Amino acid sequence: MAEKRNIFLVGPMGAGKSTIGRHLAQMLHLEFHDSDQEIEQRTGADIAWVFDVEGEEGFRRREAQVIADLSEKQGIVLATGGGSVQSKDIRNHLSARGIVVYLETTIDKQVARTQRDKRRPLLQVDDPREVLESLAEIRNPLYEEIADVVVKTDDQSAKVVANQIIEKLGF
């Protein structure tokens, strides 16, 4: 891998973007970044607080800036927020500046992986499954639109998925 290429992980909440991203970056000797963690570092507050104070629109503005900044780097693995693909600008940034990998998972797996996570503002409702289904309807076609590679994450360890990504990318 002479040229340091960026790898951008997209997919729904609970697909494993952050965990798989860390493994992938380590295996490829690349820098790992997580857009949500970067937002928290820049604001000095957690995502739930940003949502409470600025609303989803404020959060999405911050997310767009973070992804624009990070995607300028070379040789990174970036785990993006699940909703980032709803922005055409972000989709364009990701497509133009690296390889986009869509980590696909089922609603059942999303529910299982996110049910105890209180840091996901969109899921703090009576019926998180309904929210996840609604988001999937909107976002899944967008993930597919920009994906260079699609990898299913259900019932596989993060390390196995990272290896599959490396294999599919020919690294």
From Swiss-Prot:
Cofactor(s) named in the record: Mg(2+)
A GO CC term attached to the entry: cytosol
Keyword Metal-binding attributed: yes
Pfam families: SKI
Gene Ontology biological process terms from the UniProt entry: amino acid biosynthetic process; aromatic amino acid family biosynthetic process; chorismate biosynthetic process
Record-listed ATP binding positions: G14, A15, G16, K17, S18, T19, R120, Q156
Keywords: Amino-acid biosynthesis, Aromatic amino acid biosynthesis, ATP-binding, Cytoplasm, Kinase, Magnesium, Metal-binding, Nucleotide-binding, Transferase
Catalytic reactions on record: shikimate + ATP = 3-phosphoshikimate + ADP + H(+)
Annotated positions binding Mg(2+): S18
EC code(s) of this entry: 2.7.1.71
Pathway(s) per entry: Metabolic intermediate biosynthesis; chorismate biosynthesis; chorismate from D-erythrose 4-phosphate and phosphoenolpyruvate: step 5/7
Gene3D superfamilies according to UniProt: P-loop containing nucleotide triphosphate hydrolases
Cofactor binding mode and count: Binds 1 Mg(2+) ion per subunit.
Main location: cytoplasm
Enzyme class: transferase
Subunit note: Monomer.
Assigned protein family: Belongs to the shikimate kinase family.
Protein role: Catalyzes the specific phosphorylation of the 3-hydroxyl group of shikimic acid using ATP as a cosubstrate.
PANTHER family: SHIKIMATE KINASE, SHIKIMATE KINASE 1, CHLOROPLASTIC
Name the UniProt record assigns to this protein: Shikimate kinase
Gene name tied to this protein: aroK
